[in-house]
Amino acid sequence: MSLQLGVRLAASAVLILILVGVIPVVPLADRGLGTGSAAAQEVKTGPSGLPLPRFVSLSSDKVNVRRGPGRNYPVAWVFVRASLPVEIIQEFENWRKIRDWEGSEGWIHRSLLSGRRTAIIAPWDDRAQFALRDAPSGGAGIAAYLEANLLAAVATCAEDWCRLEDERFSGWIEQNRLWGVYPQEIIEE
C-alpha cells in the first residue's frame, strides 16, 4: 500500500468517526478562540441547507434513537410520545443527530421528525408552576398555571415571550421557561 493511499484511508476513517459522533468536534468559540470574529457570528448550516443546531419535534409516537446514522446501528432508546422537542445538532445523509432535554444524544431518521415547534415547560424545575399570561408581559392577567414538564405547541416567539397554543390553553410565557426554543429566538406564525 502506498503512503498516499494510507493517508487517504486514515483521513477517511477519522472523518467517518467524526460524522457518527465517536470523535467530538469542539467549535473554536467553545475553546475560547475566535469569539467576536465574523466566523463566530455566522449561522452554521448542515448539508440539508437548514441551520444547525435547530429544534424540531418527533412526528411519531414510537421513534427509535440509534447509536449511529443508519439502521445497522443498535437502538439506544425509544421515544414513545409524538411531538416531543429535540435539538438537531448534526446531519449525515437522511439521519439527524439529536439531543433531548436531558442532554442524551443519538441518531434519528429524518422521516420521523417534524418542523412543528413544541416546547417542554421548565423540565429542570419539577416543583414549580408557571403563569401563562394573557399578553406578553409580566403584568398581564394570568390565563392559567402550567406545571413543569408539560408539553405544548409553540405558536410564536418574540421579545423574550412565546405564545403557547393547546386545546386546553392559550397564552404567553417567558421564553426562558421553555426547552425547545433558543434565547431571543423569533418564531413567526
Language-model segments: residues:
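Generic structural signal for short, solvent-exposed loop/turn connectors between secondary structure elements
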Residues: M1, I16, E159-D160, E167-R168
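N-terminal secretory signal peptides that target proteins for export/translocation
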Residues: M1-V7
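Bacterial N-terminal signal peptides
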Residues: A10-P24, A29-G32
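SH3-family beta-barrel domains
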Residues: G34-R67, V78-A82, I89-F92, R99-W101, ...
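Second-shell loop/turn segments in exported
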Residues: P69-Y73
